């Protein structure tokens, strides 16, 4: 095993949730931007809005002077999915009725390890009118 491979094995596993005394506390908010296509017969509606999740992961903390930035920002699907080395909460719409799209993703990482994920959501959901 090469030295570089060994050092990677000793680094903390960043794609799993942070280890701690309990569950990861995630603050969530959702701002509804529009409601479309109310269907009384199917008992569904479509909506769009902005989802914001904030949590703390000390493994993501960094020194701004060393990193050369006051905050790390990953924006767009490529940077978020391929470049950001972070675990993030998975969101599920339990009353989804076929449409659940997320776009415009941005992940902000503060020096203390506070992460904020913001993305737009377009979805259809069952609503029992």
Region annotations inferred by a language model:
Residues 1-129:
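Soluble non-transmembrane domains of integral membrane proteins
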């Amino acid at each position: 095993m090469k030295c570089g491979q060994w050092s990677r094995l000793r680094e903390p596993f960043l794609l799993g949730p942070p280890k701690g005394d309990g569950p990861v506390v995630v603050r969530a908010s959702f701002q509804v931007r529009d409601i479309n296509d109310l269907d009384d017969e199917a008992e569904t509606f479509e909506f769009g809005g902005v989802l914001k999740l904030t949590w703390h992961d000390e493994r993501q903390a960094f020194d701004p002077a060393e990193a050369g930035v006051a905050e790390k920002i990953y924006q767009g699907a490529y940077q978020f999915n391929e470049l950001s080395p972070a675990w993030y909460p998975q969101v599920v719409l339990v009353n989804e009725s076929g449409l659940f799209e997320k776009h415009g993703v941005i992940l902000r990482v503060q020096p203390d390890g506070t992460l904020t994920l913001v993305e737009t959501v377009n979805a259809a959901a069952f609503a029992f009118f």
